[in-house]
Each structure stands twice: as C-alpha cells, then as structure tokens.
Amino acid sequence: MQIRLVFTLASVTDMNAHARQSSICGKLIAAILWLAAAVTLPQVSPAADWPQFLGPQRNGSIVQPNLAKTWPKEGPSTVWQHKVGQGFGGPVVSTGKLIIFHRVEGKELVECLDATTGKELWKGDYPARYRDDFGFEEGPRATPAIADGRVFTFGANGDFIAWDLAKGTKLWSIDTRAQFKTGKGFFGIACSPLVEGNAVILNIGGKDGAGIVAFDVATGKVRWQATDDEASYASPVAATLGGKRRVLVITRVALVALDAADGKVVFRHAWQPPMSASVSAATPLVISDQIFISASYGTGASLLRFRESAPEVIWSRDEVLSAHYATAVLHEGFLYGFDGRQEQGCELRCVELKTGKVQWSESGLKAGIVTLANDQLLVLTERGELIQTPASPAGFKPSQRAQILPFVARAHPALADGYFYARSKDKLVCVDLRAVDSSKSSSAR
C-alpha cells in the first residue's frame, strides 16, 4: 500500500498566503509540505513477492523489471544459504519474509527467514507422523501459502495449520486425516494450499463429500466441501471463468470446476492415469477461457474451453507434453515444460497452445521445473543447474548456465525482486539474478 499527500499548485499558493499571515499556520503548512515530500510508505511491487505455489498468479510466471540478461562469468552470486531437512515443499516469499517447510529430526518444521539475509526470524514445529511406504523422503510435499498476515502449511500426513506471519504463533490446526477420513496416498499428501478470498482450499480426498474442502482463513472452520473423489497430488487454482470465480482441481479421477463461493460443482471432466500407482501433480493452467491440463503415465495433455456443465475439448493427446510433477508455463501462445516421467528421463519442450504442435524438444536435462520471468525461461534441473534461455518457439538457446545446487533439486523455486530461491535435499539458497544497475532500486526490500 502506498500513501501520498497531494496538493494542487493553487492550494499551495493559498496556503502560503495564509502562512504569511500566521506564523503558527506557516509552521503547520511547512510540516505538511515536508510530510508530502518525505513520507511515502513502502509499496510492495508485483515483483517483490512469491507468496504461494507457482507464484503470485499461480501459473509459474512473474514480471521482474530488474532481472539480469547476462550473468557474471563465474555465475550469479549466492547471497546466502541455509541448511534444510527432508521435503519437497518450495520456498515462498512475502513482504521480505521467506517461509520454508521441511522435516528435521522427527518434526515438521516451519521456518521464517529474512529473505535478504537468510537470518532466522522465527520457527514452529510439531511431531512428524508420516511414514513413506516406498523409501522416499518423509518430509512435507506441499509448498506453503502466505496471505493476509498468515502462513498456511499442509504436512505430509495431513496436518493443516495456520501460523501468524509476524510472530510464528499457531493460529489454528486441523488433523485432516482424522477429521475427514482421508488416506495418505501412495506418496503422501501433497496439495499446496490455495487462498481464495476468505477461504483456503485443499484437495484432500476425504470421505462423505469432503474430497475438496474450503476452510475459513481466520478460524479454520469448513466453509464448503464437495465431491467424493480421492485426492491427486495436484494443487488447485482459482480463476474467473464464465463471469464468476471458479476453483479448478485435478482429483484422482477428474478435473473438477467449482464455484469458489459455495463449492457447487460446475463440471467434471474425466482425467485419470491408466495405471493405479501413478502421479497426477501438475496444476491446471488457465488462459482466458481455456484450461490446459497435463499428466504423465500415459495420460497426456488436453486443452479445454470452459463451458457450463461440460468443457469443450480443443485438442487432447499423449505425445505432446505429459507432465510428471512440474506445471508448464505459457508465453505468447507457446507452452514450455518437461515431457515424460522423471525416472525415465524427460525432455524440455515448446508446444504451440492452440494446436498442440511440438515446436522443439531438448533432451539431456533429465527433469526440472520451468519458471517464466518476463520473456526468459529459468530452468532449474533436478541436478541443480540453473539455465536461462529466451522463451522462444525458434529453439532452446541457453544464454546463461550455472550450478547453484547439488543433486537432487525437485522442489519448486521462488523468484522475488530479482532473487532466485531454491532448495535441494539439504540446502536452501538465495541467488542474486538482479541486473547490476538495479541494486539500488532493490535495496529497500
């Protein structure tokens, strides 16, 4: 928020005339004019925050006016690093604070750090109860959300908690597995909370009509619930479609569109991998009245047009862009994302949105996550390499590359005010991607 005191020239002239008549009035006006010139409360720009999974618009994209086009020969500098425990939840940043959610010594730990220095501001924890059946890491899978001075975390075993962003105190907590009789899934609970108005929404797969649940942000009380679907690993997204706010959720068996206000189901579109032990983790991508969805395990990709009761299928096929766990980004009519299963090797692809035509494919990167900043792709591979390349259908032409993390880096990163935040199995880093001449403008962060 920014507050300005504005005076017209005539107003100032009149007041100066009165000031000459009264020394008291003159002093008062001088003070007001000084206030008008000197007092401007800090304004958080759109580039300054990455407060939730996939960024401010929940689509993996952000405008960064101060992003460098070239990096130093030795690579971008690491401003600070912080030791982290198990988990796949990415960092989030709001008003100069960074939240990281991970598992350390038998506890799920929420840490708030100064985003500029990495200094710990507060931390909160509780006993970690999740046990993985396949030998994978047992830390949180979900990325937290920050909204209206609150932090929302969703643990691997279903502990849903609201924290005070300023102090770290626990505001309310819900054991969703106990309250809604949910399972733990093959690989734990992974939905990153979505804050929409006064509700925070989860894809939890509960019984008795509690497949998708909206909770009151202030109290944690249920505002609405819908479907009997089991949960997938995908996180919901909200958008204005058909003139109303809607919530789109990929459950275990379908893409479901709901009214954001009351949870009424608008449509269901069958969407399920053909094999049971599978992952559907990519968040729907909304482009105007169109919805792009993607999954691996023989599922493929579809472009739909929003319609009441049933979406129109524009195109749907498996050989285009089958996302395992990372959501694609869109720039000027072209999708950019990883195709294929992580353990089998993936290709980075560019796909024309309107036709589904593959423009180019780049193998050899294994798997990774793509972030769009302005017209640049920031590709974080699971090997920990950060690659910057123009978002262009003409081809994959990296301009910058640097090793910023060790293997394995699978959590979604954050990009805020020119700083790139990313984590590996045991390390969180803050990497400076600002243009050199923008450091002064970013110093007030």
Which positions does each model-derived feature cover?
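A composition/secondary-structure signal for short, hydrophobic, low-basic-content segments
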Residues: D14-A17, V39, A48
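Intrinsically disordered, low-complexity segments
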Residues: L9, R20-Q21, A38, Q43, ...
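Noncatalytic, solvent-exposed loop/strand surfaces
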Residues: Q43-R445
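Bacterial N-terminal signal peptides
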Residues: K27-Q43
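Intrinsically disordered, low-complexity, compositionally biased regions/tails
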Residues: T8, I24, I29-A30, N59, ...
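N-terminal secretory signal peptides that target proteins for export/translocation
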Residues: M1-G26
